[in-house]
Curated annotation (Swiss-Prot):
Example GO molecular function: metal ion binding
UniProt xrefs under InterPro entries: aa-tRNA-synt_IIb, aa-tRNA-synth_II, aa-tRNA-synth_II/BPL/LPL, Anticodon-bd, Anticodon-bd_dom_sf, Thr-tRNA-ligase_IIa, Thr/Ala-tRNA-synth_IIc_edit, ThrRS_anticodon
Catalytic activity: tRNA(Thr) + L-threonine + ATP = L-threonyl-tRNA(Thr) + AMP + diphosphate + H(+)
Identification of the protein by name: Threonine--tRNA ligase
High-level lineage: Bacteria, Pseudomonadati, Campylobacterota, Epsilonproteobacteria, Campylobacterales
Amino-acid positions noted as binding Zn(2+) in the UniProt annotation, renumbered to this chain: C310, H361, H486
Role, per record: Catalyzes the attachment of threonine to tRNA(Thr) in a two-step reaction: L-threonine is first activated by ATP to form Thr-AMP and then transferred to the acceptor end of tRNA(Thr). Also edits incorrectly charged L-seryl-tRNA(Thr).
The encoding gene: thrS
Cofactor: Zn(2+)
Length: 612
């Protein structure tokens, strides 16, 4: 079955087998006329077809179990697929095994999946009395609607789908949630069931293992266990509290970045957190981003709490006159921003309402774009390398709706391409995916569980310099408009630390660990030596804790291990008398002894090993 053809691919579109036969693109066994075959396997294109059909299998099973069920949409998404529906019956996660069993029953029937094309009038008649399907049709232009059938079940859908339910053997329903109709909180709440499907048993097994591993590594769970951060309902949703250990971790990253930024010619700046609405009107945020902002009124003047740092940095630029000799100007700020996120999308540190960006804005001439972007790419590589992340880049080009001259866009886009080429970086192109004011590069990192995360962005902006009438004096003594490059490598400290926590499972590398060394005196007489050693380590900028509670030695060691501290030193008579330390080293997965002076030199060297 693994070699069976299930669809073809042409012009960036998946075409299922039935449609491909009609179009002369397949004979049912092989792809024809220059199309790419899609076989039944765990490749991305095949999984899209498999998961789409599994969503229909889910809907068919729900209809059999709950005859009054009505269905909205059931798309393929990054985490598998889902279906939104409603029923008068109460459904909980405890019902998922029952629904899954019914899906397996239908799959074993080996039902042919066929397609029918209806006019709008016919489709409205076919789904008469089904307000959810009518809602789907109202969002679709044109007069042709696909209806897919398997057994007695049929559903409005554009496809693509498998030719038969017999292919669906390896799937799992993963969770149940609520979802507003069409994502609009003013509409009724529907039930959403998520699932995953693969062509192979191994694919499903590996995925479920990763899910279990992800649960263990969940940053919200680790945040509590390791004392990194918390949330408080009395303060408000999406507003994290950084606890001492989490703040230490964050400060270490901030300090490493600051040192590197200064060496790379960036200047620290600081803008206010509230700015008059007048400047948000000039920037365009007031018209285009207002629903994501918070506002307040002071002395009858409206102010907006900043959702981004760019306007403040523009005002720093405007605080003085500039010539071409001053450029490029690189401003950075760990800028606290606030964005009005709906409560349903808030998720630990990954999606919050207050966060701090590692933000920088570069003001340069057009000719300097490539060299500046090249320097950012070099900086990005060093940061990702330090944290053991693999990463990929995606270049987004000019969208249909955009501002600026074609030649200017082409020149800016080519500058980004040349910078990527200079660093021999393979990159994807998102045609038309750029902002209306300039091309961009997105930085996507891959964690230890092979999940991809959007973090940093390098954005060329030809809009805000125009809106704010920015200028510098060029070599001909004429006023010229600079280009503005928005640049965040981590994205936000909150999001990056969430990803970092899950990537390492809380086992942070020594150079950023919130507690780097645990000192465990065996009894009271060893406590003085532990305190002296603590002071010596603190002078070397090491985060160290003395575990001196009246517990057994084994219990104190287990506590240090549970806190995922990289180095544990047990201090007894021998260590105090000889000053030869007994070290449990998590990173080396070894226990060894080392003279005190040598140990202090070693940890000092470890702190100097990492730089961006």
């Amino acid at each position: 079955m693994s070699a069976e053809l299930i669809a073809v691919y042409k012009d960036e579109q998946i075409i299922d087998l039935e449609s491909a036969k009609v179009l002369g693109l397949s004979d049912g066994v092989k792809a024809l006329n220059g199309t790419e075959p899609i076989y039944f396997d765990d490749s991305p294109l095949a999984l899209e077809v498999i998961r789409h059909s599994c969503a229909h299998l889910l809907a068919q099973s729900l209809k059999a179990l709950y005859p009054d069920a009505k269905f909205f949409v059931g798309p393929v998404v990054e985490e598998g697929f889902y279906y939104d529906f409603k029923t008068a019956s109460k459904i909980s996660e405890e019902d998922l095994p029952k629904i899954e069993a019914k899906m397996k029953e239908f799959a074993k029937l080996k039902l042919a999946i066929t397609k029918e094309v209806l006019t709008r009038e016919q489709a409205l008649e076919r789904f008469k009395g089904d307000e959810l399907k009518h809602a789907v049709m109202s969002k679709i232009s044109g007069d042709k609607f696909g209806v897919y059938q398997q057994g007695e079940f049929e559903d409005l859908c554009k496809g693509p789908h498998l030719p038969n339910t017999r292919f669906l053997n390896h799937f799992k329903l993963t969770k149940l949630a609520g979802a507003y109709l069409g994502g609009d909180e003013n509409n009724e709440m529907l039930i959403r069931i998520y699932g995953i499907a693969f062509a192979t048993k191994e694919g499903l097994k590996d995925y479920l293992f990763q899910i279990e591993e992800a649960k263990k590594r969940n940053h919200r769970k680790l945040g509590v266990e390791l004392g990194l951060f918390s949330f408080d309902d009395e303060i408000g949703a999406g507003l994290p509290l950084w606890l001492p250990k989490g703040a230490r971790l964050r400060k270490r990253i901030e300090d490493l970045l600051s040192k590197a930024l200064l060496l790379r010619g960036y200047e620290p700046v600081k803008g206010p957190e509230i700015l008059k609405s007048d400047v948000w009107k000039i920037s365009g945020h007031y018209d285009n981003y207002k629903e994501n902002m918070y506002f307040t009124t002071i002395d009858e003047q409206e102010y907006g709490i900043k959702p981004m740092n760019c306007v403040g940095h523009i005002k720093v630029y405007q605080s003085a006159l500039h010539s071409y000799r001053d450029l490029p100007l690189r401003f950075y700020e760990y800028g606290v921003v606030h964005r009005h996120e709906k409560s349903g999308v808030l998720h630990g540190l990954l999606r919050v309402r207050e966060f701090t960006q590692d933000d920088a804005h570069i003001f340069c001439s057009f000719e300097q774009i490539q060299s500046e972007v090249s320097a950012i790419l070099d900086f990005t590589h060093k940061i990702m390398q330090a944290f053991d992340f693999s990463y990929e880049m995606e270049l987004s080009t000019r969208p249909a709706k955009s501002i600026g001259d074609d030649k200017v866009w082409e020149k800016a886009t080519n500058a980004l391409k040349e910078a990527l080429k200079e660093h021999r970086i393979d990159y994807k192109i998102d045609e038309g995916g750029g902002a209306f004011y300039g091309p961009k590069i997105d930085i996507k990192i891959t964690d230890a569980l092979k999940r991809k995360w959007q973090c940093g962005t390098i954005q060329v902006d030809m809009n805000l310099p125009e809106r704010f009438k920015l200028a510098f004096t060029n070599e001909h003594n004429h006023a010229e408009q600079p280009v503005m490059i928005h640049r965040a490598i981590l994205g936000s400290f909150e999001r990056f630390i969430a990803i970092l926590s899950e990537h390492f499972g809380g086992n942070f590398p020594f150079f950023v660990a919130p507690t780097q060394i645990a000192l465990i005196p065996i009894n009271e007489e060893h406590h003085v030596f532990a305190l002296k050693l603590k002071e010596a380590l603190k002078k070397r900028d090491i985060f160290v804790e003395v575990l001196d509670k009246n517990d057994s030695l084994n219990k104190k060691v287990r506590l240090a291990e549970k806190q995922k501290i990289p180095m544990i030193l047990v201090l007894g008579n021998e260590e105090v008398e000889t000053e030869i330390l007994s070290i449990r080293d998590r990173e080396k997965q070894a226990q060894y002894k080392m003279p005190l002076k040598e140990f202090l030199n070693m940890v000092e060297s470890k702190m100097q090993e990492v730089s961006f």
